[in-house]
Amino acid sequence: MSDVITPGEIDIVGILDLLPHRYPFVMVDRILSIDPGKEIVGLKNVTFNEQYFQGHFPGEPVMPGVLMLEGLAQVGCVHAFYTEPDAVGKKLAFFAGVDKARFRKPVRPGDQLIYKVQLVKEKRSIIFMSAKGYVDDQVVVQAELMASFS
C-alpha cells in the first residue's frame, strides 16, 4: 500500500492500494472526486461480464442490491482513509454496519453506477456516512453506512 494519499481522481490501481478486495469482489472502478472529510464520488461500470449476472437473473439481468451496498461501502472505506491518512498501509477499513437501505430502481448491464458518499460524523472509532447510488441522475440505492479501522 501507498504511504501517502492525495485528493483527486483515483484509478483502479490506487483503489486496490487502499482496499483488500480483489476480483471478483471489487465493486468500484474509479474514484471521480474526493473532498476529504465531506464527500467522495466513485463509479462502477456495470457490464454483462459480471459473474453474478449468470444467476441474477437469467434472461433478466439485475445487479444484486447487496452488491450495490457493497460498492457504496467500498467507496466509503476509501473515503475513510482520507479522514485518517495515518491509517494508510497500517490498518484495514471495515464496513461496520448499514441502516435504512433502500433499493429504488434496478441496475442493469450497460449502466454506469455513480456512488456518492458523504461523511456525517465520527464517533469514537466509527465513521458514519450517508450514501446514494445513481444511474442517469436517478437514485437507485441509498443507505446510512458505518465503517471502522482495525
UniProtKB/Swiss-Prot annotation:
One of its GO terms (biological process) is lipid A biosynthetic process. It catalyses: a (3R)-hydroxyacyl-[ACP] = a (2E)-enoyl-[ACP] + H2O. The active site is at 56. It is found in: Cytoplasm. Its main location: cytoplasm. Gene3D superfamilies: Hotdog Thioesterase. Keywords: Cytoplasm, Lipid A biosynthesis, Lipid biosynthesis, Lipid metabolism, Lyase. Involved in unsaturated fatty acids biosynthesis. Catalyzes the dehydration of short chain beta-hydroxyacyl-ACPs and long chain saturated and unsaturated beta-hydroxyacyl-ACPs. PANTHER family: 3-HYDROXYACYL-[ACYL-CARRIER-PROTEIN] DEHYDRATASE. This is 3-hydroxyacyl-[acyl-carrier-protein] dehydratase FabZ. The lineage of its organism: Bacteria, Pseudomonadati, Thermodesulfobacteriota, Desulfobulbia, Desulfobulbales.
